[in-house]
Amino acid sequence: MPSLDELTISTIRGLSVDAVSAANSGHPGAPLGLAPAAHVVWQKMKFNPKDPNWINRDRFVLSNGHACALLYSLLVLYKFELTVDDLKQFRQLGFKTPGHPEATDTAGVEVTTGPLGQGISNAVGIAIAQKQFAATYNKPDITLSDSYVYTFVGDGCLMEGVSSETSSLAGHLQLNNLIAFWDDNRISIDGDTAVSFTENVPDRYRAYGWNVLEVPDANTNIEAIAAAVDEAKKSTDKPTLIRLVTTIGYGSLKQGSHDVHGSPLKPDDIKQLKKSWGFKEDVDFFIPEEVSEYLAKHVSENQKVQKEWEAKLAEYKKKYPTEGAEIQRRLDGKLPEGWKEYLPKYTPADKPLATRKLSENVINALHGKIPEFIGGSADLTGSNLTRAEGSVDFQPPSTGLGNYDGVYIRYGVREHGMGAIMNGIAAFGANYKNYGGTFLNFVSYAAGALRLSALSHHPVIWVATHDSIGLGEDGPTHQPIETLAHFRAIPNLSVWRPADGNEVSAAYAAAIESTSHPSVIALTRQNLPQLEGSSIENALKGGYTLVKKDNPDVIIVSSGSEVSISVAASEELAKQGVKANVVSLPDFFTFDQQSDEYRLSVLPDGVPILSVEVMSTFGWSKYSHEQFGLNRFGASGKAADLYKYFEFTPEGIAERAQKTIKYYEGKQLLSPLDRAF
């Protein structure tokens, strides 16, 4: 007679195999190998299926997201929102069991994973957020935050560069609340890992500053797995990597081979597995009653733990009313009342400044006003201007470099890691509004994480400075050309390119208020004038008419540093007897959400429209009839010389505006916005 633990593990394996079989698609190998570890970890975790967002829950992150049949089986067994019927519809359209875990679809899924290496990196971000939240609000007599984050990672996750970036930082930051389980099954899609992955992973992680524990028989030895978890939780100054030596597809006729990784098992294989577990061979999605009762007991215990925590929170609010009210506000997802009053406002009389400097002004203005507004830079603090005056770094207290309640994170030269960590910080909850700085061109290093930000609805903020050839002498290796076109093509991503101080404040206002999409704020190195006609209110529409003439002959639509040049071009055209409106379009995403009536009032029928932006013209045809941009790489030189060389001058723009007018003269012209669908 198998023990309850053995029966539960077999049930997890059975549900996972049946889900993949029902879909005729998926990955049965990892769930078969990892089921024992999953059972042990979930029995040690504190969580409440009826309140899956409880802030002090332990988090489980499946970095090897292809093994999601395992996670879905656990969510069914512990009675989250998922049901057996959802499992039966694994990987089918319209159900909560997609082919890789999606946090927006499925309660109990902490982060969206699939691209390998992202999950462990998100877990580092969750651990950072927990540390920061705990250090900010825990008191000597009341501990409100003491949760752990557990993550399962495969060989592929550890091959990806992003996991190296974030694991290195996790070791430096001494994140002892992070426990990672490496599924060392020695198999990749190409076959045995001997063909490509032969480094000493435990030694690598020790060098990062991690504890490393090993379970050599993780297919069956749940006592050893449990002991390893207990040992990991004793750590006071290191994250822990637990090496689980497993067999992929354990028990299958094809165990230990890459054939069992990403294809359903054959019917005869499934039958022999079920027979070995003592299950009926012809019964699918079998859940023994005693397993349900066993797991329900753990849930009941956890619900008591949450009630005790809620009583502790109530006591905390009485003893520490200011902090208690702040915690409740954050848990409610609300920002501090009146925070937008601190946003800087500008007039044309104010001196020209680089928009990166104007961004710094916003960060300084909001420092201390929004406690959950935290951020950092990928080793470019002095260039990105992302550190508020008087802020404390997020660092282990033992280093003497800061404290865990610090609000500024030194990410090092780890752009991709920074992006994935930012996603984890957002996923933690507590209304974190976190930002990361680098050069715009190097946000491309983090494209994988940025795409997942948008897919996951994480309202993270990228402070992306040095946004064009205007950065000058560093040359085309650093000058973005295709970057904004790429980012604007990502669904659910707001890409701001503000033209002056009011537009910078608007970009931050929108980004901080967002609860469902990330933002990239592209900022200049060079100084720009404060514009007549700009305002936070106007910019919050994503696009607006900055220079308005009656019955214009042409409209020049632009963004960022080219807006002021376009205004000068309008003045040049006026000398030539041409009336030119100038439209500032700092964010396509926000502008597209405005009413048709408003958008057509800005970019109307009957007037030729010329777009001007000193980078790729790709995407501008949606808003203009003709496009003036830079569809080649830049060059090294002084910014002013580059703008002149590429003809991004008032005269160069005016010349192209005249050509646009001439080309469309006498032609019936609809707005580019005027479309069938």
Swiss-Prot record:
Protein's UniProt name: Transketolase 1
GO terms (BP aspect): pentose-phosphate shunt
Signal peptide: none
Cofactor(s) named in the record: Mg(2+); Ca(2+); Mn(2+); Co(2+)
The entry's keywords: Calcium, Magnesium, Metal-binding, Thiamine pyrophosphate, Transferase
Binding annotation for thiamine diphosphate: H66, G114, P115, L116, G156, N185, H261, E415, F442
Positions contributing to substrate binding: H27, H261, R356, S383, H466, D474, R525
Family in the record: Belongs to the transketolase family.
Name of the coding gene: TKT1
Catalytic residues in the record: E415 (proton donor)
Site (described: Important for catalytic activity): H27, H261
Cofactor detail note: Binds 1 Mg(2+) ion per subunit. Can also utilize other divalent metal cations, such as Ca(2+), Mn(2+) and Co(2+). Binds 1 thiamine pyrophosphate per subunit.
Lineage of the species this protein comes from: Eukaryota, Fungi, Dikarya, Ascomycota, Saccharomycotina
Organism: Candida albicans (Yeast)
Gene Ontology terms for molecular function: metal ion binding; transketolase activity
Record-linked Pfam families: Transket_pyr, Transketolase_C_1, Transketolase_N
SUBUNIT field: Homodimer.
The EC number(s) this enzyme carries: 2.2.1.1
Broadest EC class assigned to this enzyme: transferase
A cellular component term, taken from the record's GO annotations: nucleus
Record Gene3D superfamilies: 3.40.50.920, 3.40.50.970
